Amino acid sequence: MAFNTDPKSTNFLSPLGYRFQIKKMPTVNFFAQAVAIPSITVGEIPLPTAFSTKLQFPGDLVTFGDLVVTFRVDEDMANYLEIFNWIKSITRIDGFDAAEGQATAWGKEIDSPMGEEKVFSDATLHVLNSAMNPNKEITFTDVYPTGLTDVPFNTTLSDVDYVECTATFKFRKFDFVS
């Protein structure tokens, strides 16, 4: 009996074929320029031996890389401000004593319940096939921003090179839905 080793699809994955969205950030979604499926790493458990080498066994801890999104900044900076205000809402950027009405998304008091809908959001990456139709859907659960790059201004450029920023996110997990 012969084995069929032909792949189901002979088309290569194009880096141009994607749609990305984070529920909390509609303007960032529209101007997204680049996004990558984060790395995934499995921990190892070393098993010492009587010899000079040790054996490695797969562990049970999974570590995900960062979700990194590069986007063009619109002239009103609305998409930059979406992320900036999200970061500001989950941190104490103005000090420990938040004024009335300036509490973080976590709540005003230490015992108040965490406002998860304000802190986290879900994200979806639609990977498109060669005909630019949805092929795979990857969902990211409990996404939150951890970094936002600088906004560069430069009067020495000879051509208009639109401003791009990169936002870095952490998340609890990601899954391939389809």
Predicted feature descriptions by range:
Residues 1-178:
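Glycine-rich, low-complexity intrinsically disordered segments
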